[in-house]
Every structure is written in C-alpha cells, then in structure tokens.
Amino acid sequence: MSKAFSSEVDAGSRQENVSNQESRAPFRFNRNGKGSRRVLLIAAVAILAALPLTFGTFWINMVITALIFSLAVFSINLLTGLTGLLSFGQAGFVGIGAYTLGVLAKQGHPPVLAGLYGVLLAMLCGFLLGLPAARLKGHYLAIGTLGFGILTYQLLTNSVDITRGPMGLIGIPTGGIDRQTWYLVMLGVCLIVLAALVYIDRYSSLGVILKMVRHDEIAAQASGINVFAVKLIAFTVSAGFAGLSGALFAAYVRFLTPDLFNEQESFRYMMMAVVGGIGSPLGGFAASLLLTMIPEGLRALGEDNYRLLVYGTMVLLVLWFLPAGIGGLIERQRR
C-alpha cells in the first residue's frame, strides 16, 4: 500500500513539473487548436488574395479558371459526397448556366441578371431531372445523369438559331471588368460557397439529414425523413451551384462552344471531386486548383504532349497514397 501511495505521489509530482515547464516554455504552435486553424485559414485567404500582385496574367487566368471549376466540384460534393447520389451530368448544368448568360447578354440583358437567370434555369432543370432520377440508385442513376449530360450537349450543338452551335458564341458582353477584379470576385464567391458547404456538412441539421439518406435510406425513412424530397432538394441546389459555375465561366471567357460542356467535362469534374475526397469541400477546392494549374502549366512550358499523362499520373498517385483524397489528409490533420 505504501508503494502504491509513493508511486501516486511521484506521478503527481512529475505531472506538476511538466505543467510548470510548459507554463514557462515559449509559445508553441498547437496543431489541433481552433486558434491555430483560424490563423492558418486567415493566412491562406490572405495569400490567395495577394496572388494578383505576384503572378503574371497567365497564372491569374489559370487560378480564375480553377476557381470557376471548383464551383462545379462543390456541386458534386453536395450531391454525391453528402447525399450519395452519383452524377455524371454536371457539365450539362454548367452549360445551361453558361449559355443562358451568353445568349441573354448578347441580346442586351444586364450580365448579372442574365447570370441569375442561368442559375435559376439550371436549378429548374435539376429539379425536373431529380423527379425521375431521385428514384434511381447505383449505376442506373449514373447512366441516367450521363444521359442528361449528353442530351444537353446535343441541344447546345444543334440549336444553331439560339446557341450558334459549333460556331460558338463570341464576344459576350460583361461590362469590361479587369482580371484582378474578376479574381477577387471569383475568390469571394468560392469562399462563400465553400463556407456554406462546410457549415452544412459539419454544423447544420440539413447535413445530418443528407448523411442519413446517404448511409441508410430505409432508416432515414423510418425516422420520418422524406427521402424523395431530400434527394430532390439536393439535385436542385447542386444544379444551381453548377449553373453558377457556368455563368461565371461565360462571363469571364466571353466565348462559348458546346464542346466545353460535353460528357468528358463531367468526368473531369468528378475526377476533381474524387481526388479532393468525395464529401470534402476543402479537398475539392484544393483538387480543382491542383488539377487545373499543373497540367495547364505544363502546356505553357511547351510540354503539351505530356499534359494528359501527368494529369492521369497525378490522379493515380493521389488515389493510391490517399484513398480518401486530399480531404482525408485534411481531416487527419484536424484530429
């Protein structure tokens, strides 16, 4: 008994000595502290905001394009990552938002209003697609959404009187905004959408409902959740994010052709979401930047023949060493 008492006293004294040393030690970076994460977040935003002052026009264009793509990736994170609905037709919604802004702006409508119409039309199409698609599962759902993407591409290609088809829409008026302003606008929009998705995922009851539907629809239905309505809302909101991506793309590039919104682009968005980590908005944001800037940077350096090879190699390496994607790595650092 005396030995046990003495060991407890020794342990207590050692713990007190350690605490005294820590109190006298200089400030240490706490990786798991909320304050440290806030500092890192503020620093990252400040670095992104300062990029136009550091890099040239080409790289700023690449970052803006990557930010626009990230909105389409966010739409997949909401639909597939949170709700568990596999979609290979997101490029169709992006094209709807883009061409709505392009056509209306060419007719003299204000670009902001035309972009809003593009988002609303994409949401309407997402709602209509969700009516039958919300009842499908697995590969049936994947094929159904892929069919929607192909149908949208064919409509954009063959509606020559409206979209000019393969000739493309040229000279879309956007008010003459300079690149630095575009960059800051895109960065602000992406951060707002990213913050909204992170809030839904981690803090809101809607995120809990979406995850319940993803994990077990029968249990969610037994809990009183209208699974069909939840899926329909997910389709609609996801289409709105994709439509916003398309509207901003049209306003920035000012040139549209249907080939920019074919099924290959849908697979590209899905690949970015997978590399970023399905269901991780932060990972999707990082993957969209990574998988846009590095291949395009190789093209700028004259290594265009190896661009797709490097792209595929990057994807395989990430999936091999990070099965949960970049988002999984971020989550491990948080814990």
Predicted region positions:
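Aromatic (phenylalanine/tyrosine) cluster motif
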Residues: F5, F27-F29
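Residue-identity detector for glycine
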Residues: G12, G33-G35
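A charge-rich, low-complexity, intrinsically flexible signal that marks solvent-exposed coils, linkers
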Residues: V18-Q21
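N-terminal regulatory/sensing modules of transcriptional regulators
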Residues: S23-A25
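Transmembrane alpha-helices and adjacent helix-loop boundaries
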Residues: G35-R335
